[in-house]
Design a protein with these regions (language model features):
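Iron-sulfur-associated redox domains of electron-transfer enzymes in respiratory
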Residues: 4-59, 131-441
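Generic recognition of cysteine residues
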Residues: 66, 81-83, 90, 117, ...
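Short, intrinsically disordered, charge-biased short linear motifs at domain edges
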Residues: 69, 78-82, 99-103, 110-111, ...
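Short acidic, glycine/Ser/Thr-rich loop/turn "cap" segments at secondary-structure junctions
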Residues: 77-78, 107-109, 156, 232-233
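Alpha-helix N-cap/helix-initiation motif
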Residues: 83, 113, 234-238
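Iron-sulfur cluster-binding cysteine motifs and their immediate structural context
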Residues: 84-110, 115, 119-135, 387
Length: 441
């Protein structure tokens, strides 16, 4: 933060302290701390060491709550907003009407409207808005919870912690941190790929019919629900792969805690949506996991291999823009190769691009019948909490997808085995008789 900004914050801190609002001047062992990062890493290290008291004496309790108390919000205000009412760039940047005037403290975030896109955080010049972190409560669960705690990793994880860090090494790393096991969310994307292919085969009967995807992107789904709700009948009734994974784990292990790990902030908001809450207990970003590895001195590259491949090429491909549409198309071609009306895709990534595509659909300018939207440029590999550039991320994911033993979920024995554990003999039987992965929009 620039020096003049820091000075302003300190000048205003005492006035707001009387109102029990956020104070930015922190103290650690008698020494003043001028950044939230110092407090965050101190608390994270204490949690990793198994200490009960995490925050140093003198730390503002409201700021401590940002790190240790999960709530129903993704964006939190860590100090008062000092911007004039007509110069609040965060409010202008929000597409979802989630930021409103907040009395003496300037701005308030409505967690029910916020989708976690981070636009307001990027626009806030005073650094008053931050994203909620779940890593400290997760570490506490790993130390204190008696039941199993499973990590569910998004397919964009390939290459995020180093080009030589395989999924097997990441599994060993997560187990060393205390997780019971690691599951690839791409395996659940496999099942949803077949679900969407079957939905397309059932519902697209004429040249005027069309389907909107992707269920995996909460920003895309939120855009349709909040801004273009007239198109909801064209959205397949499916949960995201993250929610599908959480529901499956809890169906097989009711006492389990589920922790999703990915590059996306919007997933923190998605897990709390009323119709799907409970499937995922915590959402971590890759950067939060990296922070934990830093304070525990664990290097994934030095860990042994614990390889248990779960996913097929199509499921892994969900991580980059165009991957979902390609996955459904390849699966549909195997499912019904003689289909007369072929799947014709159009995709968009980034909020402006998605809006342009939707407006074309509403105007009748449809040049496809299967439309994929991703809120981030490049798809999940371009998520705001990815560690490596999206171009490198896509390259790493494609290499991992190409190396997969199975091309589609129809040949994937892990998927079949998982469904048999749920009481179904085939994917088709599961999708027609179970509502575990259904969602009503």
């Amino acid at each position: 933060m620039k020096a003049w900004k820091k000075t302003i914050v300190i000048l205003f801190a005492k006035a707001y302290n009387d109102a029990k609002e956020y104070v930015f001047v922190l103290y650690l062992e008698g020494k003043r701390m001028d950044t939230l990062d110092e407090l965050y890493f101190t608390m994270l290290k204490n949690a990793a060491d198994g200490k009960v008291e995490l925050a140093p004496e003198g730390a503002d309790p409201k700021i401590v709550e940002c790190f240790v108390l999960p709530d129903d919000g993704t964006v939190v205000r860590v100090k008062p907003c000092l911007c004039p009412p007509d110069e609040r760039h965060c409010e202008d940047a929000c597409e979802w009407d989630a930021l409103k005037p907040g009395g003496e403290v300037g701005i308030a975030v409505d967690p029910k409207k916020c989708v976690g896109c981070q636009a307001c955080i990027d626009a806030c010049e005073m650094e008053s808005l931050k994203t909620k972190k779940d890593i400290i409560p997760v570490v506490q669960e790993l130390h204190q919870y008696d039941g199993p705690v499973y990590a569910l990793v998004a397919p964009a994880i390939a290459g995020q912690f180093g080009a030589d860090v395989t999924l097997g090494k990441m599994r060993a790393t997560l187990k060393a941190l205390g997780f019971t096991g690691m599951l690839e969310v791409a395996a659940f994307a496999d099942i949803l790929t077949l679900k969407e292919a079957l939905e397309f085969d059932k519902n697209i009967r004429s040249e005027n019919d069309f389907q909107l995807t992707s269920c995996c992107c909460p920003m895309w789904i939120a855009m349709i629900k909040k801004l273009y709700h007239q198109l909801l009948p064209n959205v397949p009734g499916s949960v995201s792969p993250m929610i599908a994974g959480g529901r499956t784990v809890k169906a097989l292990h009711p006492q389990a805690k589920t922790v999703f790990i990915g590059p996306c902030l919007a997933k923190k908001a998605e897990k709390n949506e009323p119709d799907i809450e409970g499937a995922i207990d915590y959402v971590l970003t890759y950067q939060e996991l990296r922070d934990l590895l830093t304070v525990t001195n664990l290097n994934p590259a030095e860990m042994p291999e614990d390889s248990q491949p779960h996913a097929s090429t199509t499921g892994i491909s969900y991580a980059y823009a165009g991957g979902v549409a390609a996955a459904v198309k390849r699966t549909l071609e195997k499912l019904n190769p003689d289909r007369k009306i072929k799947l014709a895709t159009r995709r968009a990534d980034g909020v402006p691009g998605c809006k342009e595509m939707i407006n074309d659909i509403l105007a009748g300018n449809r040049d496809g019948n299967f439309f994929e939207g991703m809120g981030c440029i490049g798809g999940c590999v371009g998520g705001p909490r990815a560690i490596i550039p999206k171009e490198e991320g896509k390259k790493q994911v494609q290499a991992y997808a190409d190396a997969a033993e199975f091309e589609t979920p129809m040949e994937n024995p892990y998927v079949i085995g998982m469904l048999k554990a749920l009481g179904f003999n085939t994917v088709e039987e599961f999708l027609t008789k179970s509502h575990l992965y259904d969602r009503q929009f």
